[in-house]
């Protein structure tokens, strides 16, 4: 079941907001304890969408990130739990391994790992043509 979530928005935003460090597949300029890995990039066959990015984000215990989601994403938790505070809607979500959700562009969110194990999730982001 897909659910609208700040987390998905945050991840999509994070994926686009930070450029991958050349030759590494990892994003640069992220807070300590947060990594973003580019797993694949696909050309889009959907009108108005330039490409689809497939990425993995990891937050170590105690790590957090605040951002505004720039594009829609589809996510699936693969490890640990993630707290998502959607400052735009005023809602808080807990995302667990095995859950799936989507994000809403334009929402400001804070992603936090308050657990004792790493949180990881995979996500696809639709990058709209400019």
Predicted regions and their residues:
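Ligand-binding loop in jelly-roll beta-barrel domains
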Residues: 106-130
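Short beta-strand segments in beta-sandwich/barrel cores
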Residues: 64-65, 81-85, 100
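Glycine- and acidic-residue-biased ligand/ion/polar-headgroup-sensing regions
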Residues: 70-89
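Short acidic-glycine-tyrosine-enriched beta hairpin
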Residues: 59-60, 88-107
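Sec/Tat signal peptide C-region and signal peptidase I cleavage site
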Residues: 21-27
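A short glycine-rich, His/Asp/Glu-containing loop-to-beta-strand
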Residues: 31-66, 72, 125-126
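Bacterial N-terminal signal peptides
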Residues: 6-21
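N-terminal secretory signal peptides that target proteins for export/translocation
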Residues: 1-3
């Amino acid at each position: 079941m897909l659910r609208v979530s700040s987390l998905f928005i945050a991840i999509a935003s994070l994926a686009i907001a930070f450029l991958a460090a050349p030759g590494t597949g990892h994003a640069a300029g992220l807070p300590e304890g947060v990594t973003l890995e580019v797993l694949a990039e696909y050309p889009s066959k959907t009108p108005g969408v330039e490409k689809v990015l497939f990425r993995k984000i990891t937050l170590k215990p105690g790590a957090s990130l605040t951002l505004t989601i720039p594009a829609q994403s589809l996510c699936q938790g693969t490890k640990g739990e993630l707290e998502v505070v959607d400052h735009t809607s005023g809602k808080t979500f807990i995302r667990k391994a095995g859950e799936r959700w989507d994000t809403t562009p334009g929402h400001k969110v804070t992603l936090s790992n308050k657990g004792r194990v790493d949180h990881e999730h995979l996500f696809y982001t639709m990058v709209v043509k400019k």
